[in-house]
Amino acid sequence: RDPEMSRGLGDVYKRQLSCFSDTPGESFQTYTNPKFAAEGGYSKVAESVMVATLFTYAGPNYVAILKHLGMDAEADAAQAEIDKMKANIMESAWDGDWFLRAYDANGEKMGSKECEEGQIFIEPQGFAIMSDIGKDQGCDKKTLAAIDERLNTQHGLVLNNPAFTKYYIQYGEISTYPGGYKENAGIFTHNNAWIICAAAYAGAGDQAFKYYSEIAPAFTEETSDIHKTEPYVYGQICLLYTSPSPRDIS
């Protein structure tokens, strides 16, 4: 069908196309695209691996919609870009046991074993698993094992580990918080849910239920004295772990 559809759907369709851009800053593909590689082999634009995995996770649904609309050529082109993205993620963002969080504007890895602090981040892991990236190489199982070993606590999965203990200009605000607070190794309910879904998807049902039990109000009565919410409320964030004052869940 003509993408200039009625009721504004044409504009929606056009906006989807921007997801397939290879312009620096718009797609993780730019990191490994020689067309944009500056001296030193990177695009001088920070690249989010989380966004890349969101692309590979949501992309197949977009392909299915195109096929439903009879736009087979567009569907094939979109699938090719998804496959390309998966290959780029495996080549440039697999750290051996988990996926990187990003490359900064200097082309340095974020969320790698090579980093002094912030060696692993929660955000890209679940979507990479649910995108089947590296599944044939066991990357899903390795990632889940790393999550359990390095991110899990009694109160849920922390955002990153180890927490930052000093300011990193390339990371900005996240390294200004005390360890265990907000984006510096805090525990966010929403990205815990991503890992719960990913563990279930990968067949690790017990692991998924364990993580659910750590954040679900029905299972946290033993720690209710430190919760500043009603017993039926899922908190947005848990301020625990390495925090100087480990007491608040709000």
PLM segments and residue spans:
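Secondary-shell segments that build the walls of catalytic and ion/ligand-binding clefts
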Residues: 11-18, 22-23
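Non-catalytic carbohydrate-binding regions of carbohydrate-active enzymes
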Residues: 69, 73-109, 141-243, 247-250
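Active-site-adjacent structural elements in folded domains
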Residues: 23-50, 106-116, 128, 163-185
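Short, compositionally biased low-complexity segments
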Residues: 53, 57-64, 115-119, 233-240
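Well-ordered alpha-helical scaffold segments within catalytic/enzyme domains
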Residues: 1, 53-70, 126-137, 193-205
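Substrate-binding cleft of carbohydrate-active enzyme catalytic domains
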Residues: 1, 6-7, 44-48, 52-54, ...
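Single conserved hydrophobic/aromatic residue that forms the stacking wall/gate
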Residues: 2-13, 241-250
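Aromatic- and histidine-enriched alpha-helix N-cap/loop-to-helix transition segments
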Residues: 43-57, 119-124, 183-194
